[in-house]
Amino acid sequence: MKKTKVINSDLSRVIATMGHFDKLSIGDAGMPVPSSTEKIDLAVDNGIPSFMQVLNNVLEELEVQRIYLAEEIKVQNPKMLTAIKKRLPDTPITFIPHEEMKKDLADCKAFVRTGEMTPYSNILLESGVTF
């Protein structure tokens, strides 16, 4: 059995294949995902698992050099924005319109669906390098 934090086989596989500048998205239960993007559906109930639980888990194994958030999170979900900034205090943030984020999902290695039920709880993680 795998000993590291990410034990979901699909999620672990995607993280293992990430290269520099590749993107992985984590999002709420309502985010529409293009059919061309792999969807790893972890949602089992409202709020389970939460966005932050999944983000924290992924960050145990993925080197992130930049994050992308919807501009709308600033007004519509400031608590989540604060939590993300606290978890990634030194990571540059680029804010983009939510509609642009939805389009950008087509360029992600995968989208990880959580059970999160709060607005604009979506993030694009840009992979960095560990050297």
UniProtKB/Swiss-Prot annotation:
InterPro entries: D-ribose_pyranase (IPR023064), RbsD-like_sf (IPR023750), RbsD_FucU (IPR007721). It is found in: Cytoplasm. It comes from the Bacteria. Keywords: Carbohydrate metabolism, Cytoplasm, Isomerase. The active site is at H20. Its main location: cytoplasm. Substrate binds at D28, H98, Y120, S121, N122. GO terms for biological process: D-ribose catabolic process. It catalyses: beta-D-ribopyranose = beta-D-ribofuranose. The keyword Membrane does not apply. Its EC number is 5.4.99.62. GO terms for cellular component: cytosol. Pathway: Carbohydrate metabolism; D-ribose degradation; D-ribose 5-phosphate from beta-D-ribopyranose: step 1/2. It is an enzyme of class 5 (isomerase). SUPFAM superfamilies: RbsD-like. One of its GO terms (molecular function) is monosaccharide binding. Homodecamer. Catalyzes the interconversion of beta-pyran and beta-furan forms of D-ribose. Belongs to the RbsD / FucU family. RbsD subfamily. NCBIfam families: PRK11797.1. This is D-ribose pyranase. It comes from Lactiplantibacillus plantarum (strain ATCC BAA-793 / NCIMB 8826 / WCFS1) (Lactobacillus plantarum). The gene is rbsD.
